[in-house]
Design a protein with these regions (language model features):
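Short alpha-helical segments that sit at the start of domains
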Residues: 2-31, 94
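N-terminal helix-turn-helix DNA-binding core of bacterial DNA-binding proteins
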Residues: 17-57
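Helix-turn-helix DNA-binding elements, focusing on the entry/boundary residues of the two helices
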Residues: 48, 66, 101
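Short amphipathic alpha-helical interaction segments
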Residues: 53-71
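A short, conserved structural fragment
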Residues: 70-80
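Basic, amphipathic "hinge/linker" alpha-helix immediately C-terminal to the N-terminal HTH DNA-binding motif
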Residues: 78-97
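Amphipathic alpha-helical dimerization/coiled-coil segments
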Residues: 99-140
Length: 144
């Protein structure tokens, strides 16, 4: 399966990378969680309550973050669903997370929740340059 980021190109990739660069680590965490939950829930999508439970935050905290993401144009107004731009940004972050998880497990020897947590943090906080290198490393392996 090709990485989701390779499907983007030119101006679209610039917009998505800028979107990823403009989000905080917390916002990125919500985007990745929403993408994962949308994949699991299908068309219905997650509820605000299920998102809060998934992220282990209070309902008011989740509601406030969803408001912020809506203002940024990353989450739909009427549902707890990503917009097309939000989906693209979440796909980039998710691809980074998979690459970072491979590094955590294969290179650093971390396992389980520790590896997942560190990979999500690295994916969310990576600059566009580091994000591209993470994805390239996963696709092609380390360079000499």
């Amino acid at each position: 399966m090709a990485d989701d980021i390779t499907q983007l190109g030119g101006a679209d990739q610039d917009v998505v990378e800028r979107s990823c660069a403009d989000v905080t680590t917390g916002e990125a965490r919500y985007l990745m969680a929403l993408l994962d939950m949308q994949r699991e829930a299908g068309e219905a999508g997650p509820s605000q309550a299920s998102l809060a439970r998934h992220l282990n935050v209070s309902a008011p905290t989740a509601l406030e973050m969803l408001r912020r993401l809506r203002v940024m144009g990353l989450v739909q107004d009427e549902k707890v669903r990503l917009t097309p731009v939000g989906t693209s940004a979440a796909l980039v972050l998710s691809t980074r997370r998979r690459a970072a998880l491979a590094i955590m497990q294969d290179v650093l020897g971390l396992e389980g929740e520790d590896a997942e947590h560190e990979a999500a943090w690295l994916a969310a906080s990576a600059s566009p340059v580091l994000g591209r290198h993470l994805i390239s490393w996963r696709a092609h392996g380390p360079t000499s």
